[in-house]
């Protein structure tokens, strides 16, 4: 496998995890693509979480589990992706705080039940 300096997540670790889950043969290009997608998702989540932590009254540059949970719940795409995930020591998000976060990021409120009932593929969030 070639060494790629732009990747944060090691390719061999991804390959071992996928093999443990049942993938017998994996192309190296698929591993690089998978690593890039994971890296992009992590960067986006950390960026939104940092903005949420700055928006709080403390205005500190430390991301807490609660900030990650708030950013997941305020973003419709992350909310859909992580709908069954529980983040330890993140607490519950209040509706008032959720509205403040959504207004500051200009997100549209989103419910997964609405997504199942109709086709949102042509609409933007």
Curated annotation (Swiss-Prot):
Sample GO molecular function, one term: DNA binding
Predominant location: nucleus
Keyword Flavoprotein: no
Subunit structure and binding partners: The nucleosome is a histone octamer containing two molecules each of H2A, H2B, H3 and H4 assembled in one H3-H4 heterotetramer and two H2A-H2B heterodimers. The octamer wraps approximately 147 bp of DNA.
Gene3D superfamilies: Histone, subunit A
Record-level GO cellular component terms: nucleosome; nucleus
Protein role: Core component of nucleosome which plays a central role in DNA double strand break (DSB) repair. Nucleosomes wrap and compact DNA into chromatin, limiting DNA accessibility to the cellular machineries which require DNA as a template. Histones thereby play a central role in transcription regulation, DNA repair, DNA replication and chromosomal stability. DNA accessibility is regulated via a complex set of post-translational modifications of histones, also called histone code, and nucleosome remodeling.
Compartments (UniProt record): Nucleus; Chromosome
Stated name of the protein: Histone H2A.v3
Organism: Dictyostelium discoideum (Social amoeba)
Sequence similarity: Belongs to the histone H2A family.
Top-level taxon of the source organism: Eukaryota
Keywords: Chromosome, DNA-binding, Nucleosome core, Nucleus
Pfam families: Histone
GO biological-process terms attached to the record: cell motility; heterochromatin formation
């Amino acid at each position: 496998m070639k060494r790629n300096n732009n990747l944060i997540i090691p390719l061999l670790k991804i390959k071992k995890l996928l093999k443990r889950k049942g993938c017998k043969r994996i192309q190296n290009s698929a591993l690089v693509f998978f690593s890039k997608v994971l890296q992009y998702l992590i960067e986006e989540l950390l960026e939104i979480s940092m903005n949420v932590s700055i928006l709080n009254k403390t205005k500190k540059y430390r991301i807490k589990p609660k900030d990650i949970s708030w950013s997941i719940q305020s973003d419709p795409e992350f909310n859909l992706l992580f709908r069954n995930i529980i983040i330890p020591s993140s607490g519950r998000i209040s509706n008032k705080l959720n509205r403040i976060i959504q207004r500051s990021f200009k997100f549209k409120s989103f419910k997964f039940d609405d997504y199942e009932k109709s086709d949102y593929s042509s609409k933007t969030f």
